[in-house]
Swiss-Prot record:
Lineage: superkingdom: Eukaryota
Signal peptide: 1-20
Disulfide bonds: 77-112
Propeptide section residues: 21-50, 83-106
Keywords of the record: Amidation, Antibiotic, Antimicrobial, Bromination, Cytolysis, Disulfide bond, Fungicide, Hemolysis, Pyrrolidone carboxylic acid, Signal
Modified residues annotated as Pyrrolidone carboxylic acid in this record: 107
PTM sites of type Histidine amide: 119
Name recorded for this polypeptide: Centrocin 2
Assembly notes: Heterodimer of a light and a heavy chain, probably disulfide-linked.
Any one Gene Ontology BP term: killing of cells of another organism
High-level lineage: Eukaryota, Metazoa, Echinodermata, Eleutherozoa, Echinozoa
Residues that bear 6'-bromotryptophan: 51, 59
Amino acid sequence: MMIKIAVVLCAVMATSMVFANDVKEQELADLLDLLISEEVSSPDDAVAESWGHKLRSSWNKVKHAVKKGAGYASGACRVLGHSPQEARAKVLEAFPEMKESDLDEEQVGKYCAVAHAIHGR
């Protein structure tokens, strides 16, 4: 049962790290080695503590990457304009190859609202 939980946690963490573009191959290899080791199948306090530290560390990296990305998006929304209409117009002006149907004012407003909410502004 412990192995199944560890496999699921490892898969979730690896997926999160890949989507956050903050993945280092060595970290994933270390997690996999830890998963495969005999210590995981019968963890004692030291191994459980080590696992907890690795998971917390990985989670903090993902959280930091998401917050950093939201900060960039929030800043971009502020630079582009205060209203979704202004932001949409500026994006379409900057990227003439983009079709108007690709960028809806509602979408721009939602993206900016989410970025501001995550970033805390």
